[in-house]
Amino acid sequence: MEFNQEVKKATDPIYQKISKVMPEIEWLIHAPYIYKINKLKKEKNAVILAHNYQTPEIYHGIADFSADSLALAVEASKTSADIILMAGVHFMAETAKLMSPNKKVLLPDMDAGCSLSSSITGKDVRLLKEKYPGVPVVSYVNTSADVKAETDVCCTSANAVKIVKSLNVKKVIFLPDDYLAKYVASQTDVEIISWKGICIVHDQFNENEINNIRKNNPGIKIIAHPECPPEVIKASDFAGSTSGMINYVKDNQPKKVMMVTECSMSDNIQVENPNVEFIRPCNICPHMKKITLPKILDCLENETGEIIMDQETISKARLSVEKMVAIGR
């Protein structure tokens, strides 16, 4: 695709915003796609929802709304667009379909999965419910629609503790993230029956890495995602969802910060917090990185990658997500 004066004029304001985190030579490749996608989504009355782990050219260049999983679910339920294109992974697109079943929901790469989502099935949940009758099931939103259909209430990392406390019970089944389950257990008096799922991004971090970063960067603030191992969270200054991490940086404006999460977060947030120095030992999510501008353009042009679900699954799974949204953060 050609970078011409028309493209330059339309996309220059975006590049001025992200130039500190993107070389010009890279921008010249992205800009024509951004121009065409932004034009096409208006023609088709499409909205692009992007997760916080998307790369800057997507997050700042074409997304109409960028957020964590909880806010994306809420936004999907409110949009007046005819088409929802999810710049995220498969379970996020499914959740958007649950919240707007009459909309056309598209995912640019149907293989953009999630290690947490693939760690458990609806059948697994049914077996757990048989083993622990009467114990409510709380499922992380990072799960398939089949799992959500067997769930009492969903949660995200932003509201997991609040959701569990709201049930007013002594015991819950919490699926599928084992580390998030341990984090919730540390913040409540509820007995947690967990699953052995992990996020391949956050599982790679370790306590020694955190301590070395702190040693070499006096005064640094280290903020971690609750999907990290417990010892990493303990060694950090703050633990929170992606939105919680963004708000921490925005509100506290630390001189130096390390975000113990996916790599693109630091790039995206630095754009809006130029006075903060981001120390970047981070890990890449291979699933999120399957979403690219060329794939988004192709998906939007041809309306491929549509999320299709049967009505029974939608009806059952939607209830658990609606309960989560109603409880909020």
How would you name each of these model-derived features?
Residues E2-M259, M265-R329:
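Active-site loop-to-helix "anion-binding N-cap" substructures in soluble metabolic enzymes
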